[in-house]
Curated annotation (Swiss-Prot):
Record organism: Aeropyrum pernix (strain ATCC 700893 / DSM 11879 / JCM 9820 / NBRC 100138 / K1)
Catalytic EC class: hydrolase
Family listed: Belongs to the LAGLIDADG endonuclease family.
GO molecular function terms noted in the UniProt entry: endonuclease activity
EC number: 3.1.-.-
Protein name: Homing endonuclease I-ApeII
Lineage of the species this protein comes from: Archaea, Thermoproteota, Thermoprotei, Desulfurococcales, Desulfurococcaceae
GO BP annotations, alphabetical order: intron homing
Amino acid sequence: MDQCLLEGYVAGIIDAEASLSVSIKIQEDLRCRVRVDPVFSITQDSKDVLNVVKNYFGCGRLMPKPGQEHLTLYVVDRLEALADCLIPKLDRLPLIVKKRGFEMFREIVLTLTRMKYRRVECCVIRDLVLKSYSLSSLNKKSKRKRSLEEILKIIPCDKAVEPPGER
């Protein structure tokens, strides 16, 4: 399959079927008490379609969908794979339906990548939670276990955030 055709095919599958989600997990042993966990996934009954997508991105894994083993799930959930393989290739695709969601997802993934080896500021985590909930609001079927207010109360904000341009 030629590259232009392949990219159009993958873009169509992503626009129609992909999930760009960010789970928010309470984890008491973390300083900010919350973990922000981005995941890219596609569910299909055809492994062939998912293998084309997996080979295009060069990362992720295929597995039976839990609770619906007749379906196959393509998942990319390692931060390094999301940042180094998935995001650069998604940047090149002509997404239409998922474009806005992808831009939000990209910002969350790249922020997490930049923070990986630094002391995490809880206010940055708080901002990522807000962006994650905004991303969820783009999908009418999206359901969150906890309200945004409940999550925000859990996160200690240890540093006042200065508005841009003020010093």
